C-alpha cells in the first residue's frame, strides 16, 4: 500500500488539473498563435507560468486503483502488476487466463 498522503496528493492534483484545464489550454494556444502580437503572446506565457504547478497534467502519476502503488502500473486494467497478478490468478479479471503451451 502506498502512503495515504501520496494517494491524497494525487487526487488533489487530479482535481486541480481538471479545474484549470480549459484556462491552461487557452493560454497555451495564445502563446503559440503567431497571428497575435509578440506582447500578447508574452503575456499569455507569463500567465501560464503563474498558474499552480500542480495544475499541469505532467505532474500526474498513474496509480493502482486498489493499492495506490505508482510503479509497475498496467494502463489497460488500472492496476499494479502485483494486484493484477493476484486478481488474475483468482479469476477475478474477465478474459484473463494463465497461458500455457
From Swiss-Prot:
Record keywords, A-Z: Ribonucleoprotein, Ribosomal protein, RNA-binding, rRNA-binding
Keyword Translocase: no
Family matches, as InterPro entries: Ribosomal_uS14, Ribosomal_uS14_bac/plastid, Ribosomal_uS14_CS
Record-annotated membrane-spanning stretches: none
Any one Gene Ontology BP term: translation
GO cellular component: cytoplasm; small ribosomal subunit
Superkingdom to which the source organism belongs: Bacteria
One GO MF term attached to the UniProt entry: structural constituent of ribosome
Family that this chain belongs to: Belongs to the universal ribosomal protein uS14 family.
Primary role: Binds 16S rRNA, required for the assembly of 30S particles and may also be responsible for determining the conformation of the 16S rRNA at the A site.
Subunit structure: Part of the 30S ribosomal subunit. Contacts proteins S3 and S10.
NCBIfam families, per database record: PRK08881.1 (NF006477)
Protein's name according to its UniProt entry: Small ribosomal subunit protein uS14
